[in-house]
Amino acid sequence: MDIIVTSGPILKDPNPAIGSGWISEGSFVCTLDFDSYLDGEAFREADKLATDDLGQLGFYREEGYFGGTPECYADLGEIASGNKPGRESERERTIAINLGLGLEDMATAIRVYQSAMDQGIGTKLPL
C-alpha cells in the first residue's frame, strides 16, 4: 500500500500536482492542505473519501475551496466508531481530508519540544 501525505500551503486557486491515474489501487492519501495538490479527478477516483469535519468542509466549500471535490462518504468519526466501514478491500483507494485535527498539532509539538530540550533552548512558560 502506498501512503501519500500532502502538506504544502493551502491555496485558494490551486494548481494541483497529483492528477487522474496517479494514485494506485490500495493507496491511502491524507491531504493536510485542503485540495491544493490533488485535482478533482484524483479525488473522484477514491473509493472512499472522508474528512474529520463534514460541517467545516461544507463551510470551506462555500468559501470557494474544494470546488472539484466530490461529496464525502463519511466523516472519520463515523468510520472510527464503526458506524460506517472503512477500507473493505486491499484495492480500495481511500482519501482523508484533514481540515484541522488536533492530533497533528500534538505530534508536531512533541517533536519541537524534544528538539528544544536536546539543544538546551526554549523558554518555560508558567501555565
How would you describe each model-predicted region?
Residues S36, G40-L127:
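Adenosine-phosphate binding glycine-rich loop
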Residues M1-Y65:
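Rossmann-like adenosine-cofactor binding region
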